[in-house]
């Protein structure tokens, strides 16, 4: 790390003349940013300093690299080291292992006899991709083929369940919870930043609150987080928020609600109550949430999600790739079959569900401290939801510049300094002397 007691007069690179938005939420300022090796060595007037490379940023914004706190990039960071969907939009750090599914820790062969990973685990690939018995094994694979961006890993609750249970249609036994806790603690010692759940999915829907509390209780001593795709985001949105608050209360774990939203026309407006409950809970605990800037969701093809969707478009299908891009209703009509049969024939499959309200997205996004995240699905290679490639530019353009949901400084803070603080990502998320030089330069 550069010596912070003095300003050098020679740098590897100087980004000159830009409007520095430092990630703290404070006002922008015209300044140069000097870089030595992988760290910011100086911020200020460096017009007289020497540099091996000087980048003219006049008229541009210079910000910390964005941190995408909710991704499913577990496999992409290994197989596509450029990580183009993220690096192309200024993301320099991703948090993997969300919604209860992570590639590690999982002992290969634990689900012998099952052709495909169950439910949401298929979002990360096939059984061949679940080949990392420990988080250390996964990290070694990252080190062997380093991606262009940084990776912080959550441990998926459904992945833990898949490793110790013979089926998902019941609560875990005490012995199974103890086994999961041991694996979780091993992963936390190995650098995992927390535990995630996907309580709306078949792999975890039968997991009671007590099961989650027992596992989340492991987190506090490690300074790790509990993140959750809640049990319901429609008619039972508010009870699901209350369950999340109960888990945080009883476990003592700092908690993040993933992709907070209200789905289904009949449920629009419920964020008034959900946000009120969150605000009240924040007075006594560390509780945050993230949000993505679209009115459509995307995940595996599930009947329960179809019921709250105005329109559903297929994004992937292992068995019928020719149907990708088609509306689900048109596929059912063409095949002359039931909804259940169509799902069975298309699965494993993914879909985009149009089921949110624009005004509500803005309300949730505008809430103080809400973080920005993509929830993109790299496995949908043919017709992915645009959030995979476009989340951060859309927030900066559509919501910040065009609609004034918040200032540019606040937008950058919610994409950088705030998530770095919440997830304990040190020396990233801010432009200051001594911080890593993860930077993005863009036209505001």
Q: What are these language model-derived features?
A:
Residues 137-138, 143, 171-197, 203-348, ...:
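Histidine/acidic residue-rich metal-binding segments in metalloenzymes
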Residues 18, 38, 59, 70, ...:
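Divalent metal-coordination and catalytic microenvironments
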Residues 61-85:
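Di-metal (Zn2+ and/or Mg2+/Mn2+) metal-binding site signature of metallo-dependent hydrolases
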């Amino acid at each position: 790390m550069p010596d912070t007691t003095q300003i050098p007069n020679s740098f590897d690179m100087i980004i000159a003349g830009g409007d520095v938005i430092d990630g703290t939420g404070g006002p922008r300022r015209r300044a140069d940013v000097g870089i030595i090796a992988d760290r910011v060595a100086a911020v200020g007037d460096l017009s007289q300093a020497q540099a091996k490379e000087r980048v003219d940023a006049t008229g541009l914004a210079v910000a910390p690299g964005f941190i995408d706190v909710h991704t499913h990039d577990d496999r992409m960071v290994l197989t596509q080291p450029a990580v183009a969907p993220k690096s192309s939009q200024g993301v320099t750090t991703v948090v993997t292992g969300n919604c209860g599914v992570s590639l590690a820790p999982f002992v290969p062969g634990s689900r012998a006899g099952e052709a495909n990973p169950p439910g949401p685990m298929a979002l990360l690939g096939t059984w061949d991709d679940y080949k990392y018995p420990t988080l250390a094994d996964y990290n070694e694979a990252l080190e062997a083929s380093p991606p262009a961006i940084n990776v912080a890993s959550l441990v998926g609750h459904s992945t833990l369940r898949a490793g110790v249970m013979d089926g998902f249609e019941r609560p875990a036994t005490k012995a199974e919870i103890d086994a999961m806790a041991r694996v979780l603690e091993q992963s936390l010692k190995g650098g995992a930043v927390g535990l995630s759940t996907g309580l709306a999915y078949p792999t975890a829907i039968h997991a009671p609150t007590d099961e989650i509390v027992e596992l989340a209780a492991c987190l506090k001593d490690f300074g790790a987080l509990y993140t959750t795709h809640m049990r319901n985001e429609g008619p039972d949105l508010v009870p699901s928020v209350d369950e999340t608050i109960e888990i945080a209360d009883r476990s003592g774990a700092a908690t993040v609600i993933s992709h907070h939203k209200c789905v289904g026309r009949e449920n629009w407006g419920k964020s008034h109550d959900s946000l009120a409950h969150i605000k009240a809970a924040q007075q006594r605990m560390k509780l945050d949430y993230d949000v993505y800037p679209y009115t459509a969701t995307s995940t595996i093809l599930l009947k329960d999600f179809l019921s709250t969707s105005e329109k559903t478009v297929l994004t992937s299908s292992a068995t019928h790739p020719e149907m990708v891009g088609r509306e689900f209703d048109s596929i059912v009509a063409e095949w002359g079959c039931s909804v259940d049969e169509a799902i069975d024939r298309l699965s494993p499959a993914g879909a985009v569900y149009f089921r949110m309200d624009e005004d509500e997205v803005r309300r949730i996004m505008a809430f103080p401290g809400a973080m920005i995240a993509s929830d993109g699905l790299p496995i949908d290679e043919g017709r992915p939801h645009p959030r995979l490639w476009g989340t951060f530019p859309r927030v900066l353009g559509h919501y910040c510049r065009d609609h004034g949901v918040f200032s540019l400084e606040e937008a950058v803070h919610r994409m950088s300094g705030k998530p770095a603080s919440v997830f304990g990502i040190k020396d990233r998320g801010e432009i200051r002397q001594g911080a890593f030089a993860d930077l993005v330069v863009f036209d505001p």
